[in-house]
């Protein structure tokens, strides 16, 4: 018995228009078997160049496209986005044991942020609440272009929300894995940025202790951002010997002295981890690796990394000196910055001023526009009570030249106008070789040099100058150090105070408005 089956035969025009030409072909079936359902094969997909090879096909496809557009609603309904304060939550960026990270958009400004959402109950159950507190406390201290910024922290009964800078380039690990290894030029640039970030953290008394490519992010411009400070150590974590004693970090990147568990210098252990990262960037391999953890630790303690001969002599030398298992002879930040290989095409990154915040509080983000100091100085008015509040004591002599406990702010009183003050400060510091930037009613004084600033490697000096108005002829000048050498900062402030400040207390008390305010203040006690 024979049955017929439908076997399509296509031609280009028929296929393009969706019409199929079919012819009958005989097929054999087994005796006494049930009749088989004919099997219709789909025609093979026509080549792309046949889609519009005929006017008929073109008209047919355009007609179908118009029909689909007519059926599609012009304004599709979207599910309302979940909100956290003024942030609209978007897609998930990642997920871990204690929560997830979501992309968010600020409803007013449209700025993108990454919000880390942590589960409170899980944190308490895992007893890592101190680790989370440490990460928040650390990130609040750090404001550097190569460190992920923390903008805001809020909480509900069940969740903790950390609003972080959104870095859209992924991890450094992925960048290396994609390319296999980086060129020396690109690797040096990223290593310079990494050292700027690590040096800044150390100046603030913060030791990361878990530096690895997975904890270094890359933005869209190819610049790095150090993240994940959950295992970082602050000065209070040090014992009386000035050393850290907690063993932590990722096995392949951990320093030999950390493994010995005898106490270690957090800055030098971070330098070791940076050296491992540099090795991985330039070679695409780990300097110390083994599936057996005990063998891996033996290799790290021995410190015998095989440095490829095809690297440049400078790269080989700096790797060998950083991956020194003896922390005493290991290259420190000052030595790294002075190394010839490191200094090629090096421009130090300037940390943000302590006051250059996004002004985020209570879930609000306020964006301010920059103003030019020369054309419109933004001068804040203060009265006697606020002036007293700026000092750590009620002694008026402290107003004339007062340095706070942290040695980061020095203030003096002047009767020069704000415009004259800014002009004279700019003139003085420029003569001394500093650079000046004007931003938001402040004057930024920047020391730019490629040599290490001092033996401790504190980096370049960065000072912000701000003027507060007491009355129409009396002003307070505040000089605030964000980073750099303390002694150079004090010398510069002393010079400016001597040239521009009022040196006699009586001149301040001659002002009637100030005297009246102070009398009212004293009578209230």
Swiss-Prot record:
Its EC number is 2.7.11.1. This is CBL-interacting protein kinase 21. It catalyses: L-seryl-[protein] + ATP = O-phospho-L-seryl-[protein] + ADP + H(+); L-threonyl-[protein] + ATP = O-phospho-L-threonyl-[protein] + ADP + H(+). SMART domains: S_TKc. It comes from Oryza sativa subsp. japonica (Rice). InterPro entries: Kinase-like_dom_sf, NAF/FISL_domain, NAF_dom, Prot_kinase_dom, Protein_kinase_ATP_BS, Ser/Thr_kinase_AS. Residues 87-342 form the Protein kinase domain. The keyword Metal-binding does not apply.
């Amino acid at each position: 018995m024979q049955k017929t089956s439908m076997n399509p035969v296509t031609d280009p025009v028929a296929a393009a228009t969706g019409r199929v030409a079919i012819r009958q072909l005989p097929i054999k079936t087994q005796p006494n078997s049930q009749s088989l359902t004919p099997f219709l094969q789909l025609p093979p997909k026509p080549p792309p160049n046949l889609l519009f090879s005929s006017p008929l096909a073109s008209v047919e496809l355009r007609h179908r496209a118009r029909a689909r557009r007519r059926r599609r609603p012009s304004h599709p309904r979207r599910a309302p986005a979940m909100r956290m304060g003024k942030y609209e939550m978007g897609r998930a960026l990642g997920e871990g044991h204690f929560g997830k990270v979501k992309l968010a958009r600020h409803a007013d400004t449209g700025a993108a942020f990454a919000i880390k959402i942590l589960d409170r109950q899980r944190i308490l159950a895992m007893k890592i609440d101190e680790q989370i507190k440490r990460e928040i406390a650390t990130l609040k201290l750090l404001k550097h272009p190569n460190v992920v910024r923390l903008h805001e922290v809020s909480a509900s009964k069940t969740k903790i929300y950390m609003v972080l800078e959104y870095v859209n380039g992924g991890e450094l690990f992925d960048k290396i894995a994609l390319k296999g290894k980086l060129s020396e030029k690109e690797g040096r640039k990223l290593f310079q940025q990494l050292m700027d970030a690590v040096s800044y953290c150390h100046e603030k008394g913060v030791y990361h202790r878990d530096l690895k490519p997975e904890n270094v992010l890359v933005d869209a411009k190819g610049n790095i951002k150090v993240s994940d400070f959950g295992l970082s150590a602050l000065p209070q974590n040090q014992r009386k010997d000035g050393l850290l004693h907690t063993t932590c970090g990722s096995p392949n990147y951990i320093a030999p002295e950390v493994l010995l568990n005898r106490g270690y210098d957090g800055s030098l252990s971070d330098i070791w981890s940076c050296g491992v990262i540099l090795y991985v960037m330039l070679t695409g391999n780990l300097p110390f690796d083994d599936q057996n953890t005990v063998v891996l630790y033996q290799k790290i303690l021995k410190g015998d990394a095989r440095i490829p001969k095809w690297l440049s002599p400078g790269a080989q030398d700096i790797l060998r000196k950083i991956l020194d298992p003896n922390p005493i002879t290991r290259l420190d930040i000052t030595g790294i910055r002075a190394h010839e290989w490191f200094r090629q095409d090096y421009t130090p990154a300037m940390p943000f001023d302590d006051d250059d915040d996004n002004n985020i509080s209570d879930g609000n983000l306020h964006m301010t526009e920059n103003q030019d100091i020369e054309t419109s100085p933004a001068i804040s008015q203060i009265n006697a009570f606020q002036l007293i509040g700026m000092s750590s004591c009620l002694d008026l002599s402290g107003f004339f030249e007062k340095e706070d406990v942290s040695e980061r702010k020095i203030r003096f009183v002047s009767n020069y106008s704000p415009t004259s003050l800014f002009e004279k400060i700019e003139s003085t510091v420029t003569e001394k070789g500093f650079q000046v930037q004007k931003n938001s009613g402040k004057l930024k004084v920047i020391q730019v040099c490629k040599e290490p600033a001092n033996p401790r490697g504190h980096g370049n000096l960065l000072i912000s100058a701000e003027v507060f108005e007491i009355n129409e002829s009396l002003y307070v000048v505040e000089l605030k150090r964000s980073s750099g050498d303390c002694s150079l900062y004090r010398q510069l402030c002393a010079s400016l105070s001597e040239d521009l400040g009022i040196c006699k207390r009586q001149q301040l008390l001659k002002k009637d408005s100030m005297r009246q305010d102070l009398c009212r203040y004293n009578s209230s006690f």
